[in-house]
A protein has these predicted regions:
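C-terminal outer-membrane beta-barrel translocator/porin domains of Gram-negative envelope proteins
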Residues: 1, 60-198
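Transmembrane beta-barrel wall of Gram-negative outer-membrane proteins
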Residues: 2-85
Length: 198
């Protein structure tokens, strides 16, 4: 997988505690373990602001062109159906509560995050993506060692009765689940000759 992005950020937009960002991105995948390739190109502006002492709300928009190509004849019909290009136009929000640097105990704290993206404002994709994250951090042995634990989950629900595309689904990376090759963990179509990850 390869990716390149260019991000412009202004942490004090309009002279206030408003974090304005705009990201231009280009990502490709070409795994030896998969008989298809992907390319995604797009733009994603966002605006983040505090709504409490430890809470911030982020409002975002994403416009992306996702292309799936080089799908082989031995791939699952699920993958062959996704072959081609689709435009995603999505509005989203994310709320983050983080007291790791401002809580009563300066050596420990939590971070909680919940967000949703609503695709369907134009484009070809109509779905809702919901994500949640919870993390805990503490320092031990005279603050010489930092321990962190994080749990994260998400779901993508189609709003028009169509199946989600492979570019909209989740894949665990080697940072999240060690001991597996790229695309080595996840659902498969066992009836397909190559049994590619779906």
């Amino acid at each position: 997988a390869n990716s390149a992005s260019l991000t412009f950020g202004e942490p004090a937009f309009l002279g206030r505690d408003l974090n304005a960002r705009i990201e231009l991105f280009y990502r490709t995948t070409s795994y030896d373990q998969a008989d298809y390739n992907t390319r995604s190109i797009g733009i994603a502006p966002s605006l983040s602001f505090p709504i409490s002492e430890n809470g911030r709300l982020t409002l975002s928009y994403r416009l992306a062109e996702d292309r799936i190509f080089d799908v082989t004849a031995s791939s699952s019909p699920i993958l062959r159906r996704d072959d081609g290009t689709a435009i995603t136009s999505a509005l989203g929000y994310s709320y983050t509560y983080d007291n790791r640097r401002s809580g009563l105990d300066i050596n420990s704290g939590v971070v909680l995050r919940f967000g949703q993206d609503f695709a369907g404002l134009g484009g070809d994709i109509t779905n809702v993506e919901t994500t949640a994250l919870a993390g805990y951090q503490t320092q031990v042995y005279n603050e010489e060692i930092t321990l962190r634990a994080t749990i994260e989950g998400g779901a993508v629900n189609s709003l028009d009765g169509q199946n989600t595309r492979i570019t909209d689904r989740y894949f665990l990376s080697s940072r999240q689940m060690r001991g597996f090759e790229p695309l080595g963990l996840g659902p498969r179509d066992l009836a397909a000759p190559n049994q590619d990850a779906l």
